[in-house]
Structure formats: C-alpha cells, structure tokens
Amino acid sequence: MSVTVAVDCMGGDHGPVVTVPAVFAFLRSHADARAIAVGREEVLAPLIAPVAKEFGERLRLQPATEVVGMDEAPATAMRNKKDSSMRVAIDLVKSGEATAAVSAGNTGALMAISRFVLKTLPGIDRPAIATVLPSRDGRTYVLDLGANVDCSPEHLLQFGIMGAMLVSAVEHIDRPTVGLLNIGEEAIKGNEVVKQAGELLRTSGLNFKGNVEGDQIYTGGVDVVVCDGFVGNVALKTSEGLAQMLATFLREEFSRNLLTKLMAIVALPALGRFKRRVDHRRYNGASLLGLRGVVVKSHGSADAFAFEQALGRAADAAANRLIERIEERMSAMSQEAA
C-alpha cells in the first residue's frame, strides 16, 4: 500500500531545521512513500526547491499560515488557528489526501485537534497515546502515556485492544501478548479499576498474560503494557530521567583519569553497541490510537534522525492497515457481546 504522510513542518522545538531534512531522509529510505510538507510557504519553499527534481511528485508543499505554540492552550489552538500547520496536516488525513500525519508540536493541541477533526473509531471512548520502548527481548509498547489520567476498566480494555492491533500491524505478530501494569502479578493486587480491567482483559480474546510490574517493561515478557495515562506518563518520564543519569555517570567515570580514558577506548565497540540499543531517538514517535486516521506525535526536541523515525512509524502503521485492524477487532467484540 502506498502511503502519503502529511508533515507539520513548523512544529517542535526546532521546526523546519529538523523536520525538512527528516522528510528528505524518509523519502530516500521509503521509495514508495509520498510526503506533504505543511507550513509557511515562504519558509519551506526555499528549503524544498533544491530537491524538487529528486523527489518530483512524491513531495509537495501545502501552505499553512499559522503555527501552534508549544505552550499554547489546546482549546485556543483549536478555535483560533484553523490554518495552523498542525491543523492543516490533520485536515489532509480527514480529506483522504494523506494516509497519516506527523507533528512534533504541542501534544495537548495535537490530541484535541485530531480528536475534533478525525473523531474516534466506533467502540472507542477515548484515544490513547502509545509508544515503544527498548526491552531485553526487543521492544515493548506502552499505553496510555498521558492522554487519560482517570480511566475506567472499559477504557483500559480498549487500550489493550488498540495496543495489540498496533503491535500486530507494525511488528507483524499475529497474537501479541498483553500485560496490565500493576503493583504485583497476583490478580488480587491493585485498585478496583485495575482489578476489574484485569477481568475484562482475561475474557477479551486477547493474548492476555495477566498483571505485570514496572520492571517488565524493560525485562520483557509481554509485547503490550496497558496502564492509565497518569501511571504511564510517570513511568515514561522516570525512564527518560534514569537513562540520562546513566549516560552522565558513564561519561563522568570514563573521563575521570588517564586509566579510565584508556579503558573507554578499549570498551568503545561495546559502548557503541550499547548506545545504539538504548538510543531514545530510534524509538521516537508516539501513536495517537483510537482515531479515524493515523496520527503520530514526535518528541518536541527530536533531531532529524529521531523525527525520521516518527515518519517511518506513521508510514508503517498506515501501510499495515492499523485503523482497519482496530475497527475490525472492535466490531467483532461488539457482535460477540450482542
């Protein structure tokens, strides 16, 4: 399936300096893909002109006169900036001109605009934010990461379904394993919402493996970890802080004296492999699941390499029918319940 990704080129901490080169790299690595660069024409046109011949019809510019600020209130952005690069990118998905949209802009605004323009899929009460993290077994998908602070058991069930369909689509795993994040593996652990969610997941037809603790996000064991947005966001930010601390400690210890500097040289190949495995840029791109269209949120501080990963993540989800998979699963569950 050929995909067209609408790119909010003005969003994020760095804007076109990062997003435009990332679009070029994405098109070079995805020969069948197309991209629509959305943003201020006077800014983007000079950047795109030098590669116009290389990409031809695979890359076009869609003018948008406004930009959503990183600290702007979502309601304000939705009401007052209907020609923002973020809004126009989502509108392109709604109209069918694009099969996915990617933005590094304001998360709250992106979720609000996406939900308003695209609407949620049948059977989905609330969209959720899902991302992939490195684990000992390969990678683990976690949701929700902050879109929904307070959740019902039914919401957590829907997150499990959407997460499983995401992994099935992009990792090509027929029956992804699903775990429910809890304070212990026993079914009696957790608050009432989590315990009831566990019961719903056990009878859902998903490949549910029961409760998992926080360490299993990284030690592996399940493909999808389900939690509410409060817990998920805390877990994610804690992980990011820990990774930064470990990197700082390694740099400090290896630069302490001549001997440790020599040890660093000897260990360089292993350190390089370690860095590649835990490089957060490789995992950039959180999917906004539950919408009638593929939308991926890049980290606001992403560099060109990281933003390219988000573009690839969006293209993979669209090409592998993520939205249709979720619709089909929700429809099947609705028929079973009837």
From Swiss-Prot:
Enzyme class: transferase
Subunit structure: Homodimer. Probably interacts with PlsY.
Protein EC: 2.3.1.274
Organism from which the protein derives: Azoarcus sp. (strain BH72)
Similarity annotation: Belongs to the PlsX family.
GO molecular function: phosphate:acyl-[acyl carrier protein] acyltransferase activity
Keywords: Cytoplasm, Lipid biosynthesis, Lipid metabolism, Phospholipid biosynthesis, Phospholipid metabolism, Transferase
GO biological process: fatty acid biosynthetic process; phospholipid biosynthetic process
Cellular compartment(s): Cytoplasm
Protein task: Catalyzes the reversible formation of acyl-phosphate (acyl-PO(4)) from acyl-[acyl-carrier-protein] (acyl-ACP). This enzyme utilizes acyl-ACP as fatty acyl donor, but not acyl-CoA.
InterPro entries the record matches: FA_synthesis, Phospholipid_synth_PlsX-like
A GO term from the CC aspect: cytoplasm
Annotated protein name in UniProt: Phosphate acyltransferase
